[in-house]
Amino acid sequence: MEARLKELKQKALELIEEAKELKGLNDVRVAYLGKKGPITEVLRGMGKLSAEERPRMGALVNEVREAIQTRLEDKISNLEKAVIEAKLATETIDVTLPGRPVETGCHHPLTAVVEQIEDVFIGMGYEVAEGTEVEKDYYNFEALNLPKDHPARDMQDTFYITEETLLRTHTSSVQARTMENNKEKGPIKIICPGKVYRRDDDDATHSHQFMQIEGLVIDKNIRMSDLKGTLQVFVKKMFGEDREIRLRPSFFPFTEPSVEMDISCMMCHGKGCGTCKGTGWIEILGAGMVHPNVLEMAGYDSKEYQGFAFGMGAERIAMLKYGVDDIRHFYTNDVRFLQQFKRA
């Protein structure tokens, strides 16, 4: 038995030395130290030895097993180290090479347009007011002269969360809250930018979510001419000094009288083209004098205070300003499209 153990040890160490891969070493471990290996078989036969031989043979078996185990661990460590070194050799980085430039981002065109619009109105003394996108039905409709049974509610399909809670369909709700909170202080001069939501089918000119910017002025002796002058300044700042405006009668429940504003086409300069559908004019926003009912519901005396309001879509302004033909481009995150506006 002693001679057999020495032979097993020598053979195992030779196989370990010859192994070139981790799989070969695992095969040696299973063959010699596994449950069905010769070392285990010797241990099972220890019971047949005399009491005098058993301690000596037990020590020899342990010595052989430890020698094989130690050599296996050393060889495995060496092979793993060699694998890592070979991998590192193929992945060597030449630190003298120039680094890859980091691509710089840019303002999203909608962000750029909203900031430009804000700058124009801040320059005219307006403040920026913001509000919650999840709104109560009261502030989105009722406080704006749209009671629950008003037929004009059908003009806007709404995302309702509960019977009295919804995703705002316009930022006019910010105006309603501002008027209510400011009735003791008097005059108001604000613009309200923010996301709004309507149940529209997405296409080239419509989106279920879009950016809207509304304006509100409340003070004594406010007239329609003040509204027109304000919008003229805005248009010339945004689209150039040669742009003209015209106001057409319209209807909005929260303003009276109500108008829609067109600007002279920047493509054909009023001569008529495909962009303006041959009219020479392009519609960009709605506006009007604040309805007396809206003033009264907010706590203002409509005989003492008047006001005007206007609202526009940031996407609409951006499409006209930059010649974008599909509103969906603003939301597809196409880097090729966005890179065009690095200087926007």
Swiss-Prot record:
It holds the Pfam family Phe_tRNA-synt_N. The keyword Acetylation does not apply. GO terms for biological process: phenylalanyl-tRNA aminoacylation. Binds 2 magnesium ions per tetramer. SUPFAM superfamilies: Class II aaRS and biotin synthetases, tRNA-binding arm. The keyword Aminoacyl-tRNA synthetase applies. It is an enzyme of class 6 (ligase). It is found in: Cytoplasm. GO terms for molecular function: ATP binding; catalytic activity, acting on a protein; magnesium ion binding; phenylalanine-tRNA ligase activity; transferase activity; tRNA binding. It catalyses: tRNA(Phe) + L-phenylalanine + ATP = L-phenylalanyl-tRNA(Phe) + AMP + diphosphate + H(+). Its EC number is 6.1.1.20. Keywords: Aminoacyl-tRNA synthetase, ATP-binding, Cytoplasm, Ligase, Magnesium, Metal-binding, Nucleotide-binding, Protein biosynthesis. GO terms for cellular component: cytoplasm. Mg(2+) binds at residue 256. NCBIfam families: pheS. Tetramer of two alpha and two beta subunits. Belongs to the class-II aminoacyl-tRNA synthetase family. Phe-tRNA synthetase alpha subunit type 1 subfamily. This is Phenylalanine--tRNA ligase alpha subunit. It comes from Bacillus cereus (strain B4264). The gene is pheS.
